[in-house]
Curated annotation (Swiss-Prot):
Name of the protein: Uncharacterized protein HI_1602
Family assignment from sequence similarity: Belongs to the DoxX family.
Topological relation to the membrane, as annotated: Multi-pass membrane protein
Keyword Cell membrane in record: yes
Organism in which the protein naturally occurs: Haemophilus influenzae (strain ATCC 51907 / DSM 11121 / KW20 / Rd)
Lineage: Bacteria, Pseudomonadati, Pseudomonadota, Gammaproteobacteria, Pasteurellales
Keyword set, alphabetical order: Cell membrane, Membrane, Transmembrane, Transmembrane helix
């Protein structure tokens, strides 16, 4: 019995740490975009469909906004699966547009880091935020709402 309780706590803590790690990485990238200049116009033609049809300025602001907003949702564990899925789409577009042709090596701007981010985001998509989250609290407050199982 004690082992099961400790396992639940460990799982909650590890998912919390994972959420904080991903939030930091994506928020930092969002801040770089916030403080930098839009370079998406230079690579717009490399974006996959349908993102290549969207103007570079809009893509820039959507990417920046996603990298600034979704990390906060991850930290608090609110709409975690949706946030992780959205960030997975974002990093997949980045992988396809920037990193895919550069090989695996991080030093060559390769796809190693995007791959790590996708794998860790998949954990949150499949497992959710864990016990130490507002998603879990919301499910406890509203146990009869069947749609909350997707949180």
């Amino acid at each position: 019995m004690k082992d099961c309780k400790m396992q639940g706590i460990g799982s909650g803590v590890s998912l919390l740490i994972l959420r904080f790690f991903l939030a930091w990485e994506f928020f930092e990238s969002g801040l770089e975009k916030w403080n930098g200049q839009n370079w998406f116009a230079e690579i717009q033609d490399r974006f996959p469909f349908p993102f290549n049809l969207i103007p570079a300025d809009i893509n820039w602001h959507v990417a920046m906004g996603s990298e600034l907003i979704f990390p906060f949702l991850l930290i608090f564990g609110v709409l975690t699966r949706f946030s992780a899925l959205s960030l997975t789409i974002l990093i997949s577009v980045a992988w396809y547009s920037i990193h895919a042709d550069s090989g695996y090596n991080v030093c060559d701007n390769g796809y190693k880091l995007p791959l790590i981010y996708v794998v860790t985001l998949l954990i949150l998509i499949t497992q959710g935020a864990g016990k130490l989250s507002l998603d879990t609290l919301i499910k406890k407050v509203y146990p009869t709402k069947s749609w909350l199982k997707f949180l």
